Amino acid sequence: MIELNASSISESEQGENLGKMSFFGGFFEGLAGKNIPKILSIFSVFLSCFFILWIVNPEGVLFTRTTPTGGDLGAHIWGPAFLRDELIPNFRLSGWTPDWYAGFPAYHFYMVVPMLFIVFLNVGLILPVVILVAIGSSWILIQLIITKPKHWRVFSFAMCCLLLFVIPIHYGIAFKFVTVIGLLIMPFAAWKMGRLSGLEPVPSGMLSAAALAFIFDQSFNIMGGNLMSTMAGEFAFTLSIVCCLIYIGFLIKGVETGDNRALASIFLALTGLCHLLVAFFAVLVSLVAVATRPSRASFRWLSVVALLSGSISAFWVLPFWWQRAYLNDMGWEKLTSYSSYLWNRNELAADFLKNEPPLQIVIVLAVLGTLFSFMFRRRLGVVLAISAAITAFAFVYLPEGRLYNGRLLPAYYLSLYLLAALAVAEVFRLLGLLVDRNSSKDKNFGNLFEAGLGFIAVVSFIFYLAVPLRVLPGGSMQGNAYHWMGIETENLNLGRSWVLWNFSGYEEKTAEYETGGWEELVDFVVTMDDLALEHGCGRLMWEYSPKLVGYGTPMAPMLLPHWTDGCIGSMEGLYFESSVTTPFHFLMQSELSEEPSRAQRDLPYRSFDISSGVDHLQQFGVSYYASVSNLATTEALKHPSLSEMAKSGPWTIFKVENSELVESLDYQPAVMKELSHSKWLVPAVNSFMEGSGGVVKTIDGMDNWQRVTQEDAPELLPLPKVEISEITAGTDYLHFKVGQIGVPVLVKISYFPNWQVKGAYGPWRATPNLMVVVPTEEEVELNYARAKIDIVAMGITFIGLISLGLVARRKNSDDFSTAWFDTNLISQKLKETLISSESKNSQS
């Protein structure tokens, strides 16, 4: 029987010196010393990261000067460029844009930090500063390497990052790099989590393999975190997972020692700022970690970290929460095949999705890893196991609502992979102890044996993942089967081919489809630009068609504002949840497209109806309509309010008549009583579907306006015709003149509470999601301003950053030596109980 010395595997003793390490110290320490297990562990991480780089850079596309395309990713291109060109120069990280959805608050409800990374890489600094910073940073870097002061590795890494950020990088390359950086460093993040939490090199190295299993998971493609989801546009989610893994490492160590409050706060804040859904999992893990070792000190540690991370991220999170009533709910349908998604994955969303790696085997290993974690006092494993169980419970019992339960699956799967890796690592450790027990010469041979097994396991797993990716040297295809070294499989992981499609870019797409190709897309953009020069800038409603994938993604026309410098806006945009105009767009899309996407659930969609569609275009002040199908083009040519202006490839472009941005109302608006902004959608949709001939309904308004319930039919109270002139629209403002004051007019810009008006009363939210103002002066100005909550949030973040610096400089004086309860002592107490019971039995 192998005798296990609990003290030799205690987390606190294994992690005793970790607090003295720099952030990257543990990584480079193994390379500098002669410790073979550490070297093999680090080399495992290196191989894992290099393997990912090999996969995400097919044919060198990662470094080609092209514009990424493919799914949502191809539409994400708009965002960082708008941030760079419009928001940051105006000292904003969120603000108004007219480019999509008749205007919406950009980065108010979508994560801005990942986009900032792209901007920083793309812009760099101006050339003189580049030269000075490059010279200075290089000199400092050399001095750091020579003198090796305290924390020299951290400062050296910072200098390298600074050099990277000051050099301008092509926008497409910067975008591609940030897209995959989360994938590239996830194995390192998993390894670092293990080392911070007190694990030895071998199990930490195995965690990097667990990250690989998650990245190349073939069972989901839009939930977030794996390669396919990242290529679908969920790169912010992947970055958030990386931050979350490192935070968990600091968390596990922090509840035992009280160390690293500042660093833990930074990574928890980054987790939320990169993606809120991952932050929910981080909060869950935090509560579980403290529950496994509750004490006054651990509660204080977590409270400080929570307050710091919350205040640091307040500049974005607080306005998001405060104005959450203006979020759009896409109506995601809850996944109810519970046994499939949590156990065997035999009912997945698409034919190309597979149960790879096999989830049943992973779960068996994860259960074993959980038992080992309790037996051998691995707090990381205990916390992950409890968190995975709670996540699975939430997946089943979370009611259908705004939080789509499918988004919980990545955290569940990742936890299982990490636990499975811990199980395999423990088996290797036990085998190493067995070797040591039977070795009469070198008592360290067991450690080498364990390390060798761990390294071989990681390498073997990389080959296992490489086979369905079909990238191994010497591999060949015979029919649908891939052959390599006697191995035959028809399994195909689409990840690498998806990368090639996306990163080869818009520029490399050719007209292989009925519609498509870069040249055709460029001609369409140029045609719209030319029309705008002659007939004015404005919004475009383009017919949706699956055939548009020939451009790289059916969302390609969303980039018209990007390519026309904001002159031509697209009614459809990417950030569906960021605008309450989104459902009205999809209703129009359904009326004006032969094959609409109808992306939002539970809406009263109509089939193709040119009359209703044009009426709705006029309601939203849309200037142009572009048809691509024969049906849409034929019907549009017959409509009296549409004038054909140009043709471009398969597109026919029409001018929409009587569609100004400001319009006189026929009837007095009606204020809907007891209606909150969060309940706006249903009555607004009902009013929208009735057409433009009815009474505009509002939330709040002038005292003399009629008040109605949602069921009431408002009276038709005619208003005098108001002459409107000199309409001038900018990115975040609208100016116009009226010929008569005191009469309400409709402003066809999406409503948001940050809008302020000068020279009028209002603005009030009006159906479908526009604004009504009552001029008090001839000249009326609307401007998108900072709300009070925005200013308060920035102040809290400023205070948080100062507090972060103070906490980082102050040593935690709380006593972490005792706890009210500790899961790490369960096995010890159980062993003592068994020994005591055996002793009593022997005495009797």
Specify the residue positions occupied by each region the protein language model found.
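Membrane-interface transmembrane helices that cradle and orient dolichyl/undecaprenyl
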Residues: 138-151, 239-263
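Alpha-helical transmembrane segments at the extracellular/periplasmic loop-to-helix junctions
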Residues: 132-135, 237-242, 277, 315-316, ...
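Membrane-interface alpha helices of multi-pass inner-membrane proteins
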Residues: 250, 261-275, 287, 308-311
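Active-site-proximal, structured, solvent-exposed surfaces of multi-pass membrane proteins
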Residues: 11-13, 130, 702-838
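Active-site lumenal/periplasmic loops and adjacent helix-entry segments of GT-C-fold
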Residues: 49-131, 153, 165-245, 249-250, ...
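Periplasmic/ER-lumenal interhelical loops and adjacent helix-loop junctions
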Residues: 70, 301-375, 476-526, 690-695
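Extracytoplasmic/lumenal acceptor-recognition loop(s) of multi-pass membrane glycoenzymes
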Residues: 91, 95, 111-112, 268, ...
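Perimembrane helix-loop-helix junctions
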Residues: 281-308, 433-443
